[in-house]
């Protein structure tokens, strides 16, 4: 039996639309991510467990884990009879890389079960392909950090899909999921087809400056450059209370905040534990909309997807 855990991730990070993402893990030790188990069997089967299992498609072939198994078999050119179990701990349409968690855990578990016939680059390419079936287009800003860990910059040149960018140990990521769903496809459809020249220049300046600040170890500058002129001005209308929440967390002391992925999760970066706790308390009382919502104080997950049992 192989059991693989794949962590949540926060894509875009305001400054890097479709090209930046960070894997995150709660500081209290909770597992914020999906778990997939693979066991040898006579025929294929898939069982769904976990807090959000009831939100998965009722038709098994529509389940992305089934599609991962099917695509992996096609890649190897043979049917692999296994019993798969998906522990769905991540809310769907949350902006926390929920589909990436399932895809990464499923493909990594299949690869481990079969003795690692695929290298990490090929496996990551498959992960992007499968996740793209849900989001509507291939982009790696969730699957890359989820699989490899840390903060990842998408490269997609010279057979390199992504490379790690150094983060800051003092940063605490407060993630608040309000309990509503925002479809990635819907959130992409709301974006304009063309952008003004000054917005393109500002975006390039912010992203280049952010990467420079990370490598030159300037956390204050990096946080200051986490601005979004590409997606947030258009997507915030999908997120009730988002603008007020951003203003509130800034007043409390967050050094940066924005939409995690395509939302509705809000991320707030803090550089002190007491500030992070006050931000988390405010968001828990004011940004969550129902019982399915939650707030976690996290750090970068530098390990990425990992085998829990083998």
Curated annotation (Swiss-Prot):
Location(s) in or outside the cell: Cytoplasm
Enzyme class: transferase
Any one Gene Ontology BP term: threonine biosynthetic process
Annotated GO CC locations: cytoplasm
Primary subcellular site in the record, as a coarse category: cytoplasm
Pfam family name, one: GHMP_kinases_C
Keywords linked to the UniProt accession: Amino-acid biosynthesis, ATP-binding, Cytoplasm, Kinase, Nucleotide-binding, Threonine biosynthesis, Transferase
Positions annotated to bind ATP: 91-101
Pathway connected to this protein: Amino-acid biosynthesis; L-threonine biosynthesis; L-threonine from L-aspartate: step 4/5
Domain of life: Bacteria
Molecular functions per Gene Ontology: ATP binding; homoserine kinase activity
This protein's record includes keyword Endoplasmic reticulum: no
EC numbers for this chain: 2.7.1.39
Catalytic activity: L-homoserine + ATP = O-phospho-L-homoserine + ADP + H(+)
Family as reported in the entry's similarity comment: Belongs to the GHMP kinase family. Homoserine kinase subfamily.
UniProt xrefs under PANTHER family: HOMOSERINE KINASE, HOMOSERINE/4-DIPHOSPHOCYTIDYL-2-C-METHYL-D-ERYTHRITOL KINASE
Function statement: Catalyzes the ATP-dependent phosphorylation of L-homoserine to L-homoserine phosphate.
Protein name as annotated: Homoserine kinase
């Amino acid at each position: 039996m192989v059991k693989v855990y794949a962590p949540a991730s926060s894509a875009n990070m305001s400054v890097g639309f479709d090209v930046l993402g960070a894997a995150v893990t709660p500081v209290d030790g909770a597992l914020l991510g999906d778990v997939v188990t693979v066991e040898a069997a006579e025929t294929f089967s898939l069982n769904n467990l976990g807090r959000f299992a009831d939100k998965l498609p009722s038709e098994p072939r529509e389940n992305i884990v089934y599609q991962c198994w099917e695509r992996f078999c096609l890649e190897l050119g043979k049917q692999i009879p296994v019993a798969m179990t998906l522990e769905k701990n991540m809310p769907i349409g949350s902006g926390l890389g929920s589909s990436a968690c399932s895809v990464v855990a499923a493909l990594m578990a299949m690869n481990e079960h079969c003795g690692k016939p695929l290298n990490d680059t090929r496996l990551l390419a498959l992960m992007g392909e499968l996740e793209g079936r849900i989001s509507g287009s291939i982009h790696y800003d969730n699957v890359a950090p989820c699989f490899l860990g840390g903060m990842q910059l998408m490269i997609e040149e010279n057979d390199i899909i992504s490379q790690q960018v150094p983060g800051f140990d003092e940063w605490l990521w407060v993630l608040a999921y309000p309990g509503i769903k925002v479809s990635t496809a819907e959130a992409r459809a709301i974006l304009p087809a063309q952008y003004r020249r000054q917005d393109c220049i500002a975006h390039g300046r912010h992203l280049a400056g952010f990467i420079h600040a990370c490598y030159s170890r300037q956390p204050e500058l990096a946080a200051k450059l986490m601005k979004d002129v590409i997606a947030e001005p258009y997507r915030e209308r999908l997120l009730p209370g988002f603008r007020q929440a951003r203003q509130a967390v800034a007043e409390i002391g967050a050094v940066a905040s924005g939409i995690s992925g395509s939302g509705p999760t809000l991320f707030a970066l803090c550089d002190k534990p007491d500030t992070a706790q006050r931000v988390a308390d405010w968001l828990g009382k004011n940004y969550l909309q129902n019982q399915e919502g939650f707030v976690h104080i996290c750090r970068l997950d530098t390990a990425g997807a990992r085998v829990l049992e083998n």
